[in-house]
Amino acid sequence: MKVYDVVVIGAGPGGGSAALHAARAGLRTLILEADPEIGTPVHCGECLSELAVQNLDLEIPDHVKALDVRGIRVIFPDGTEKLLTEEGYVLEKHLFERWLADEAVQKGAKLLLG
C-alpha cells in the first residue's frame, strides 16, 4: 500500500493549488477527483488578482487567461455592488484547473480520476 503525506480531495482551484504546493515541497501527494476529467462540468468563471497570483507563487500560462483586468465590479445577490481595483486575470477555469493538476503531477503528485 502506498503511503501519502497529503491527500487532496477535489482538483478544483483550491485542491489543485494545495496539491501543487505540497508536491513542490517534496511531500508525497495524492489528488482524488470524483469526475472523470478535471475541469468538467464547467460551473463558473474564475478571477484571480495579481496579488493572489504572487502570494500563491504561480506563473499562470497565457493559454488559461481569458482576459487581463484592471479591476472588477462585483454585484451581490441583494443588488449591492463593490468595485475592486486590483489588477488581475479572468481565467478559463477548466483550463486553470487542468494546468494546476498537471503542474502538481509534474512535481511528483499522483492523480486519480473518478
Placement of each model-derived feature along the sequence:
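N-terminal Rossmann-fold NAD(P) dinucleotide-binding loop
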Residues: 15-16
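N-terminal FAD cofactor-binding segment of flavoenzymes
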Residues: 34-72
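Extreme N-terminal starter segment of soluble prokaryotic enzymes
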Residues: 2-6
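Glycine-rich FAD pyrophosphate-binding loop
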Residues: 7, 11, 20-42
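Conserved N-terminal helical subregion
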Residues: 71-114
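Short, well-ordered alpha-helices that flank and scaffold nucleotide-derived cofactor binding pockets
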Residues: 20, 24, 54, 102, ...
